[in-house]
Amino acid sequence: MINRRKFLLSSSSAFALTQLPSDVDAKNGIKHYKLVAEAAEHIFYPNAQKSKLSLYNQQSPGPIIHAVKGDILEVDFLNLLDEPSTIHWHGIRNLNEMDGVPGLTQPAVEPGETFTYRFPLNDTGLFWYHAHTQAWKQVTKGLYGPLLVSDVNDETHHRDVLLVLDDWLLDDNEQLQLDSLGSLHDWSHGGRHGNFLTVNGQSKPNIEVPSNGQCKLRFLSAANARIMKFELNKKIPMKIIAIDGSPCAPFAVEKLTVAPAQRYDILVEDSSQLEELIEVSTSERLTAASFSTTKKTQEKFDVNSEHKPWYPHPQTTHAKIIDIHMQGGAMGNLAAAVFEGEEKSLRDLAQNDAKLWAFNGEIGGYGLTLADIALGDTVILRVWNDTRWRHAMHLHGQHFWVNSKEFGERNRQVLRDTYLMQPSEKVDLIFTADNPGL
């Protein structure tokens, strides 16, 4: 077994957002990193008892992986947990065998074992990496981190302000509540909601921003289920310039809704006005972070040249249409579903199999194939969220356009990998199948 000291040559023990040092093979364009998943302890409040977390490199969030478009990313992953794990590279149009889904694209990485992820970075933007084995537990305990891919000519990093969001469910001792992980109540009610908000692993941090110029706020939600909504002090307009990593034609919103796994890049025209980031999804307005200014800058982002989707909206005249009927959860419309070849009542599924959700009347395993799609086909996933719960829908290996009411006509200019579906909503997720895989 490889020990942590030998595997990880250097890391920070502080619970703050830091960049992971890399070994660069310039000749071959390879960026090499090391990630260790292991048990960790963390104190959420002064004088509180220690919480038992699982972290990458003893950091919360995991360290920033920063690379340049065109690089080959190579990450040596060491699993020092007492259970299997893998890493999914969320939002990356990845090689199938590098996608991190245990039992489908790779075997799970067993305790004490290593696995090397190696894949090209073909798109710029903000992505993230997270555990994909029992993600309901491992991600909730802290196994996630940001992945930032820049353009080789981008000289604006000093004005990027990364905001990694999470909400944690703490008990009366200010410790992460572990006993309720995987509870049927959470699974049937749209997921686990916390009661303690962190930004970059801290409660109400003070974050430095450049003064007298533009800055870019880059939001990433690692929450299990909570759908957050933010505004800035004085209701400063937030100009959306990228969604899920992909640039879009800029448009302003007063409040920004961020679902689990979504990312938004927000352009603030005058950063000297920034004072607070406020969470406003409930009647209680919460200060999520405060801002203070650093050195002056008069530089500006060239949004006209930069902010176009990676590729154009496809023609859909001859698209392959795949219907997906999503049912389940509490107060839903699922009475029974087929699981492992047998139709069972929802009560039976919940009590004996801990299964509560179904697509097209079936509870999927990796032995079921939704559809066979030819390379290059245009596909419309016609999804009906026939439940009482909002749900963030994510595609692996593909980005898509959405035909919905959320951004109206702007949807044709917005490319995503995660979309927040409303209860009873019907939407079309449209993509070109240009990345082979399962």
Kindly give the residue locations of the regions a language model identified:
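Asparagine-centered strand-capping/turn motif at beta-strand->loop junctions
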Residues: 77-81, 219-222, 383-387
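Extended terminal and domain-junction accessory segments
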Residues: 18-20, 24-34, 139-171, 248-380, ...
